[in-house]
């Protein structure tokens, strides 16, 4: 039996001369906290009032192809800040998945089964040198490989290990996953909800900075929609690098609901080629060199 559907207009709350955008956020978030929405909400989307979807100017026609819209912004509560990655399992010299062992001390002194097994993943995102930074510009000059100005083409879009820049972490693309037994007794990689996933699958991950290095990513959901596109030959590798990098920054510098509801206590951040300030590290005069190394040298 088919489930009936209901189609309604979506209500937008605007920032006006009499009502700030923070007041509009407060109305929506208060309704959500009171359970007044019939559907699950996990954040807010901010769109310009005078632009069509995908447009950059008021008279732009709508685009009939997939494109990143730089004028639309999404906010999620800190606990929902996640990144979609294409996972690749570490391999042995024979081409099999590498399986490591961890000794679980103090579990059961009477048991000999205190070794837990895990797999190591490389987390990849979509990367295009023309949009996200050149991997080896010096060699490109030697080879007379000049950059293209066609930034909307996805010809150079490929999966690359995730090296974030803000904050920089050379090990952010490494993820260890404990393998668990399925109903048939086999050892599988699973999300925290019990979904089985394998090599070359797109998975949504959350990040916990309090965990040990290498164990900070937790798989929470298999992205069957994106994985299906990948298997059909489309260039879907999870989040694009600039999206993953932005989400990474939000994970480490979350915008809270209180900031959105009041417009208060929003941290000021100075970001330029010479000095970068943030609440954890203080001033750094090497950001330009770090960004060059992270985006161009690797």
Question: Where does each model-flagged region fall?
Answer:
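Nucleic-acid 5′ end/cap handling module spanning
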Residues: 2-298
């Amino acid at each position: 039996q088919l489930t009936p559907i209901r189609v309604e207009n979506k209500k937008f709350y605007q920032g006006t001369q009499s009502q700030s955008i923070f007041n509009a956020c407060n109305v929506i978030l208060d309704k959500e906290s009171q359970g007044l929405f019939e559907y699950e909400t996990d954040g807010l989307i901010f769109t310009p009032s005078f632009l069509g979807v995908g447009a950059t100017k008021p008279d732009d026609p709508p685009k009939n192809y997939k494109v990143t819209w730089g004028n639309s912004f999404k906010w999620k509560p800190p606990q929902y800040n996640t990144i979609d990655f294409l996972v690749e399992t570490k391999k042995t010299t024979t081409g099999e998945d590498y399986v490591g062992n961890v000794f679980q001390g103090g579990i059961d002194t009477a048991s000999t089964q205190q070794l837990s097994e895990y797999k190591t993943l490389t987390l990849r995102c979509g990367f295009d040198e023309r949009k996200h930074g050149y991997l080896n510009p010096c060699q490109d000059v030697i080879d007379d490989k000049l950059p293209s100005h066609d930034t909307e083409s996805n010809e150079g879009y490929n999966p690359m290990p995730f090296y974030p820049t803000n904050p920089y972490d050379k090990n952010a693309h490494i993820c260890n996953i404990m393998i668990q037994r399925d109903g048939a007794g086999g050892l599988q990689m699973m999300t925290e909800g019990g979904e089985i996933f394998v090599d070359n699958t797109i998975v949504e991950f959350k990040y916990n900075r309090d965990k040990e290095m290498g164990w900070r990513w937790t798989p929470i959901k298999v992205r069957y929609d994106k994985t299906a596109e990948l298997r059909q030959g489309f260039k879907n590798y999870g989040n694009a690098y600039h999206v993953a990098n932005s989400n990474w920054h939000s994970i480490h510098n979350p915008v809270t609901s209180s900031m959105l509801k009041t417009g208060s206590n929003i941290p000021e951040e100075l970001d330029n080629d010479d000095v970068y300030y943030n609440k954890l590290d203080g001033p750094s005069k090497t950001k330009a060199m770090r960004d060059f190394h992270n985006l161009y040298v690797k």
